[in-house]
Amino acid sequence: MKQTNERLCALAQKGDAAALDSLIDNNKSFIGKVANDLFRSMNLAQSGLNLDTDDLKQAGNLGLWKAVPKFDAARGMKFLTYAAPAIRNAMMDMVRDAFAAFEQRMVTADKDGVCYPRVRKVEVLP
């Protein structure tokens, strides 16, 4: 018999590693759906950020893992309802970090191949 997310979360909060693994396994399809939706909606395949859906799924797993200790079943909320924003936010954090790293790599090269760092207006103007 499959245990509920709320019961598995309560066990995981008490230190049961097997319950945490089961909780992640029970929600793999949801995490995969969120990752695929985000990958398509942000057009990450064409972005040049070197991210794929597996990266987003891994970030989603971490988001779910971080939501476990903060979940309070006494508030009457289902675990996945509580964890969904944490899962999506973890994926968005990964995309933001990848974009920031991509921006830092952007340079302008002249005809001699000399590279100059990108300069923003706020760095030049008073």
Locate the predicted segments by residue.
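Charged, low-cysteine interdomain linkers and short loop/connector segments
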Residues: V95-R96, A100-P126
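Alpha-helical promoter-recognition and RNA polymerase-docking modules of transcription initiation factors
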Residues: M1-E103
